[in-house]
Design a protein with these regions (language model features):
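A short acidic-to-branched-hydrophobic micro-motif
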Residues: 40-44
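Negatively charged, low-complexity tracts enriched in Asp/Glu with abundant Ser/Thr
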Residues: 1-37, 53, 59-129
Length: 129
């Protein structure tokens, strides 16, 4: 096992049993499913450097066609990853409490509206990927 693999597994273990190491978009990342439709991807930690900072993505959805990045938090030191993930879980619960509990609602929150790219065909909207 490489030093990078050892480091990411140790970090994952330190975060707790709710986390796991997996591959997303060809990158080894740490993942946590909140169980409420939201999940987090902790990117940038498959490294042998203790100084490398993480990027944490809050996602909604679990299938390729129904996923959206809701929030991105950058430059998080290793020792603050767990705290930031807990804040994102609180944020996800707040979104749900405010009615943002579907891909379409979160898309409209993030981008302002659903955009019609159908050349003027009434009521035909397409998502941007």
């Amino acid at each position: 096992m490489s030093k990078r693999d050892t480091m990411i597994r140790a970090l994952c273990k330190s975060l707790g049993v709710d986390y796991r190491v997996t591959t997303i978009d060809l990158e080894r990342v740490i993942y946590r499913d909140f169980g409420n439709g939201f999940n987090v991807e902790i990117s940038g930690m498959h490294t042998s450097s203790m100084k490398k900072k993480a990027t944490i993505y809050l996602w909604y959805g679990d299938t390729m066609t129904e996923c959206i990045i809701v929030k991105t938090v950058r430059d998080i030191p290793r020792e603050l990853i767990g705290e930031n993930v807990e804040e994102l879980m609180k944020y996800s619960n707040l979104l749900i409490a405010q009615g943002y509990d579907s891909y379409d609602k979160l898309f409209r929150l993030k981008y302002g509206k659903t955009i019609n790219y159908a050349g003027g065909v009434k009521n035909m909207t397409h998502r941007i990927f």
